[in-house]
């Protein structure tokens, strides 16, 4: 169990072997903040050491809040939760998971894409990367939040080697409901 209660604002080292990486990443008001609106400080990450027997299955739950200030750009770029063969401190590719990251060959990625990137593709995605080749397993297209708004809610991620992965979000304009 990990929470960020009790850590002072600005904390970037939790003292537990995890790595908080990125110019914007820090604890703020008892929460992990990975980026700051309007500052272009993307590609932050929080990685934890390998957990023994996690390949036998796991469940992760957390509360998430995404806020976009008014008058800047539309919300960008997104975020992902990743499980795979990457090193501590790996920053990933935001909403693209670990795609095209050197040395990352096998990965499960639970993705939330808040930016249109020049086309209508945005939404939630469950992807896998095997031997370096990424495959999208489930995708729901739609906005996550509008310019100048906030969304929040619980996220539940599970992996079972026999039945696969599931990804569920609540409180977004477009939610993941991949069972």
Regions found by a protein language model. Name each.
Residues 1-179:
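Polar, low-complexity loop segments and adjacent catalytic/binding residues used for recognizing
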């Amino acid at each position: 169990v990990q929470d960020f209660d009790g850590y002072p604002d600005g904390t970037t080292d939790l003292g537990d072997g995890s790595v908080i990486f990125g110019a914007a990443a820090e604890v703020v008001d008892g929460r992990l903040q990975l980026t700051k609106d309007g500052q272009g400080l993307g590609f932050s990450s929080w990685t934890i050491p390998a957990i023994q027997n996690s390949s036998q299955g796991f469940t992760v739950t957390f509360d998430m809040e995404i806020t976009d200030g008014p008058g800047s750009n539309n919300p960008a770029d997104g975020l992902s939760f990743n499980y795979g063969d990457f090193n501590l401190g790996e920053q990933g590719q935001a909403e693209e998971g670990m795609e095209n990251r050197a040395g990352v060959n096998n990965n499960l990625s639970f993705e939330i894409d808040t930016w249109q990137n020049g086309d209508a593709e945005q939404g939630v995605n469950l992807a896998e990367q095997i031997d370096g080749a990424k495959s999208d397993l489930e995708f729901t297209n739609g906005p996550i939040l509008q310019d100048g708004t906030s969304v929040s809610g619980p996220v539940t991620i599970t992996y079972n080697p026999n039945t696969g992965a599931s990804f569920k979000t609540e409180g977004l304009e477009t939610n993941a409901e991949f069972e």
